[in-house]
């Protein structure tokens, strides 16, 4: 049986984390990028992770952050996986000795085709919509048909997903992992528990 794994990104409160876990999320994402409306600091991150049950993975999202700050956060917050969303290269990403996901902002098929070669040590790649000045969480989607024949390194689909379109997205791309942030929000940084539950329920129905 194939299970569609779900990550709810941009969690900012313990209550939203607990609701995501209760709905069946496999992972939650904490944004440590101060340029984001969904950013959290170490103190807030500790409260969020304390609200989670066992076996829900915590993913820390960084954008062009210094190695020193990343190490400080990893030392204080229980992080399972790092997600790099900026211009980091493989050598930078692998130095923390933690499984990492590299976000790829997709414009053309070559972005997808070359990603595994550029990031050989990544546990997975996350394919997101390209934006010239923003690093994820834009609500934009890219051409999902570009992924229809992809069979490389494990990957995650992101970019403009919602409870209403995640089914179509999975059918077109064959994604086995999906990541959502803005598509399940009531407002910037605040999740809508009903939308979170609907998103995860749809993904679960697609599992086989």
From Swiss-Prot:
Gene Ontology terms describing biological process: L-tryptophan biosynthetic process
Pathway the protein takes part in: Amino-acid biosynthesis; L-tryptophan biosynthesis; L-tryptophan from chorismate: step 3/5
Top-level taxon: Bacteria
A molecular function (GO) term: phosphoribosylanthranilate isomerase activity
Catalytic activity, reaction form: N-(5-phospho-beta-D-ribosyl)anthranilate = 1-(2-carboxyphenylamino)-1-deoxy-D-ribulose 5-phosphate
Pfam (any one): PRAI
Glycoprotein as UniProt keyword: no
Alphabetic keyword roster: Amino-acid biosynthesis, Aromatic amino acid biosynthesis, Isomerase, Tryptophan biosynthesis
Gene3D superfamilies: Aldolase class I (3.20.20.70)
Main enzyme class: isomerase
Homology family: Belongs to the TrpF family.
Name of the featured protein: N-(5'-phosphoribosyl)anthranilate isomerase
Species for this entry: Neisseria meningitidis serogroup B (strain ATCC BAA-335 / MC58)
Originating gene: trpF
């Amino acid at each position: 049986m194939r299970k569609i794994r779900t990550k709810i990104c941009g969690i900012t409160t313990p209550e939203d984390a607990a609701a995501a876990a209760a709905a069946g999320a496999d992972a939650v994402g904490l944004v440590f990028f101060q340029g984001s409306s969904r950013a959290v600091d170490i103190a807030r991150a500790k409260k969020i992770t304390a609200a989670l049950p066992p076996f829900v993975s915590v993913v820390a999202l960084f954008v062009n952050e210094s190695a020193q700050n990343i190490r400080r956060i990893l030392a204080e917050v229980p992080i399972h996986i790092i997600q790099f969303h900026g211009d980091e290269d493989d050598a930078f990403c692998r130095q923390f000795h933690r499984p990492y996901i590299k976000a790829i902002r997709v414009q053309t098929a070559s972005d997808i085709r070359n990603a595994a070669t550029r990031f050989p040590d990544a546990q997975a790649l996350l394919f997101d919509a390209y934006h010239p000045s923003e690093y994820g969480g834009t609500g934009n989607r890219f051409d999902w048909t570009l992924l229809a024949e992809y069979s490389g390194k494990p990957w995650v689909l992101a970019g403009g997903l919602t409870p209403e379109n995640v089914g179509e997205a999975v059918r077109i791309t064959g994604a086995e992992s999906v990541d959502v942030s803005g598509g399940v929000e009531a407002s910037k940084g605040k999740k809508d528990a009903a939308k979170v539950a609907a998103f995860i329920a749809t993904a679960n129905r697609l599992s086989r």
